[in-house]
């Protein structure tokens, strides 16, 4: 059987349909990110998203039949809009204290800029495993990167890794910066002191 060529009109209709579907999907993602960033994932309902995105429930579920897919798309969207600090530049610094100070100096302004959004999302992380996943993975990788140049083993390595994990933890930064009123430079030096103490350099 010989396939009939698709007419220009049909091609145009298919293209317009795909564009409309992509636009609808984008509106749903943007609406979800908006609510995740303000009231948090736990309070973000399908009804809220549908009202904000101007879609029906059936349309929402056609695009996102499960929450895991929606979380993944929202993570990708957020990281495109507000990418996490690049860790490659820190990895090139051999001195452990300089690497630590450089990394914290880069990430704390990011925390400050996105504090409301991160606080809303991470607040719900315990009850919603999908919330904050990309950021927690970033924290874990960064902690390991900062602990590596100390070249420690055993319990000493465990202490250094834990201290580095605390230093890059958003909630730890928030406690010192927002609640205690320290500026980012002061928080950096406080965390450097903590990690050096864990390494036995206090």
List where the protein language model places each region.
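Short, basic, alpha-helical segments at the C-terminal edge of helix-turn-helix-like DNA-binding modules
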Residues: 46, 75-83
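Basic, helix-initiating cap at the start of DNA-binding domains
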Residues: 1-55, 69
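Short hydrophobic/aromatic patch on the recognition helix
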Residues: 54-64
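Alpha-helical DNA-contacting segments of helix-turn-helix folds
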Residues: 36, 64, 69-78, 118-121, ...
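Hydrophobic alpha-helical connector segments
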Residues: 73, 86-113, 136-139
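Amphipathic alpha-helical segments that line or abut small-molecule/effector binding pockets
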Residues: 30, 97-119, 188-196
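Short helix-capping/turn signature of helix-turn-helix
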Residues: 64, 123-127, 167
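Hydrophobic/aromatic-rich alpha-helical bundle segments in the mid-to-C-terminal region
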Residues: 149-194, 202
């Amino acid at each position: 059987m010989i396939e009939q060529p698709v007419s220009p009109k049909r091609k145009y209709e298919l293209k317009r349909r795909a564009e409309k579907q992509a636009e609808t999907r984008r509106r749903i993602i943007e609406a979800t990110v908006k609510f995740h960033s303000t009231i948090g994932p736990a309070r973000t309902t399908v009804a809220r998203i549908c009202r904000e995105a101007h879609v029906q429930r059936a349309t929402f579920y056609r695009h996102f039949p499960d929450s895991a897919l929606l979380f993944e798309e929202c993570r990708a969207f957020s990281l495109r809009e507000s990418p996490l600090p690049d860790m490659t530049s820190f990895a090139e610094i051999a001195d452990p204290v300089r690497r630590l100070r450089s990394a914290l100096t880069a990430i704390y302004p990011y925390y400050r800029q996105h504090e409301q959004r991160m606080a809303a999302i991470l607040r719900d992380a315990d009850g919603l495993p999908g919330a904050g996943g990309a950021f927690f993975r970033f924290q874990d990788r960064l902690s390991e990167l900062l602990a590596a140049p100390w070249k420690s083993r055993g319990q000493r390595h465990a202490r250094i890794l834990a201290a580095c994990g605390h230093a890059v933890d958003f909630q730890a930064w928030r406690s010192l910066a927002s609640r205690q009123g320290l500026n980012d430079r002061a928080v950096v030096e406080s965390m450097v002191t903590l990690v050096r103490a864990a390494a036995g350099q206090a």
